[in-house]
Regions:
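Positively charged n-region of N-terminal signal peptides that target proteins for export
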Residues: 1-4
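Bacterial N-terminal signal peptides
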Residues: 6-15
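Boundary at the C-terminal end of the N-terminal hydrophobic targeting segment
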Residues: 19-23
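Short, conserved catalytic-motif segment at the N-terminal edge
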Residues: 25-83, 103-105, 122-126, 398
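Active-site SXXK
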Residues: 30-36, 56, 82-110, 118, ...
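Short, surface-exposed loop or secondary-structure junction motifs
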Residues: 115, 120-361
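Short, surface-exposed beta-strand/loop micro-motifs that present aromatic residues
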Residues: 366, 373-386
Length: 426
């Protein structure tokens, strides 16, 4: 892999492709274009797309590279990507809407809503003969614990016991077509933090309590009110040409990843909608979710969440429990990932929270997360901006992508020194 070389000066000038935004009579110049082009031109990334916005909407976007492995279709900022676990924020918003309506309670054990979850077991490991060692769960997780990843559910890609259980046939793999939601817990609810399938169960709760399939709930209560016309579980045939090939690292090369490519599907045809992943979207569409959060839960005269609910999303809901690095158990799927980027972190309602910000520029209590195919976002309410950076590469936490993301963030924040983005919506 060639090293990404980007020289980004603190003194910014206008170049072709720079984005300019007017704020209270001042001119603000954003030029992260060089960061993105450098990574693509060096061959570190085949495709990259990025966007920056504030409470008034998207103010800058740019794409570089190609949508396809044959390099016949140039990248565009309105390309549709698979956002994977960025779906989790949408599912969390849906669940919080039901909390506001009284259909869910954050601290009620979920077997009150899903009786079949009574009597859960915890997988503690294996004996010398590969026999699973179970103990009874003290109780079912709560809705809050599902949202904060303290429920005990994990992913086999970052948990060696869960990976071993899937390999031995003790549980269904989350990467297959089986009933992976029936997996045991990895720890007693509320005692630890580990990223996992909790948000899939949260999506199931949304369906159960709203009596609506998740795709339909999202469309009616989130996508349509926010004007998100390019966000789908089932991609329409007419939009397939706007999608991006998922690539995988193969030594110093990038090759198409098997079985993970975009495909068109008829609306309503999926048997299972994953609350933890599966959406297609554009950065412009997803940015409207982040813009809504910067506006305290409302956009275009539509209230998606109450302001106090949005405030709660950016607050610590795990106490002294520390979100840990995601230690890989499946290197082809993910590298070991430090989503806190070396800074102190906690977890809110659906967001990793940086109480002290991070060195790349995010301010105190910025919320963030990511998607498996190396798409990343952050919402910085103190600065009044959001940012999204996306590729379509495996494994997750790709070194070249993370390096480019860090430089992109520094470019965004350097470009606004001495200026503050307006928080008022248009």
């Amino acid at each position: 892999m060639r090293r990404i070389l980007v020289i980004f000066c603190g003194c910014l000038t206008l170049h072709n492709g720079a984005a300019i935004a007017q704020e209270s009579g001042a001119t603000m110049v954003i030029e992260p274009k060089a960061v993105i082009e450098s990574a693509v031109n060096a061959g570190d990334l085949a495709f990259a797309v990025a966007a920056v916005g504030n409470a008034g909407g998207e103010i800058w976007s740019y794409a570089s590279g190609h949508k396809d492995a044959d390099k016949k279709r140039a990248a565009s900022s309105n390309d549709i990507i698979q956002i994977a676990s960025m779906t989790k924020l949408v599912t969390t918003i849906a669940a919080l809407q039901l909390v506001e309506r009284g259909a869910l309670e954050l601290d009620t054990p979920i077997d009150a809503y899903v009786p079949e979850l009574a009597g859960l077991q915890v997988l503690n490991g294996f004996d010398a003969n590969d026999g699973p060692l179970f103990e009874q769960a003290s109780r079912a997780p709560t809705t809050r614990e599902l949202i904060t990843h303290t429920a005990g559910y994990v992913y086999e890609s970052w948990n060696s016991n869960a990976r071993r259980a899937a390999n031995l046939g003790v549980t269904e793999s989350a990467f297959g077509s089986g009933n992976f939601l029936a997996s045991p817990l990895a720890f007693q609810p509320g005692t630890n933090w580990e990223y996992g399938i909790s948000t899939d169960w949260l999506g199931a709760l949304v369906e159960r309590r709203s009596a609506t399939r998740l795709a339909n709930y999202f469309a009616k209560n989130i996508f349509q009110p926010l004007g998100m016309d390019d966000s789908h579980y089932e991609l329409p045939e007419g939009k397939l040409h706007r999608t991006v090939t998922v690539m995988a690292r193969a030594g110093d090369s990038l090759v198409p990843a098997p079985m993970l490519q975009p495909q068109a599907m008829e609306a309503g045809s999926m048997a299972f909608y994953s609350g933890g992943g599966g959406l297609y979207s554009t950065l412009s569409d997803y940015g409207r979710v982040l813009q809504m959060l910067l506006n305290g839960g409302s956009l275009n005269g539509m209230t998606i969440l109450k302001p106090e609910t949005v405030d709660a999303m950016f607050s610590n809901h795990v106490g002294d429990i520390q979100p840990a690095a995601l230690t890989t158990a499946m290197p082809s799927i993910s590298n070991t990932a430090d989503m806190s980027f070396g800074a102190p972190a906690t977890f809110g309602l659906g967001l990793l929270i940086h109480p002290q910000g991070i060195l790349n520029g995010r301010r105190s209590n910025t919320g963030s997360w990511a998607g498996l195919f190396n798409s990343y976002y952050w919402v910085d309410r103190e600065s009044g901006i959001y940012g999204i950076f996306g590729t379509q590469i495996l494994p997750f936490y790709d070194a070249a992508t993370i390096a480019t993301l860090a430089q992109f963030e520094r470019a965004v924040y350097s470009s606004k020194v001495g200026s503050k983005l307006t928080r008022s919506a248009k």
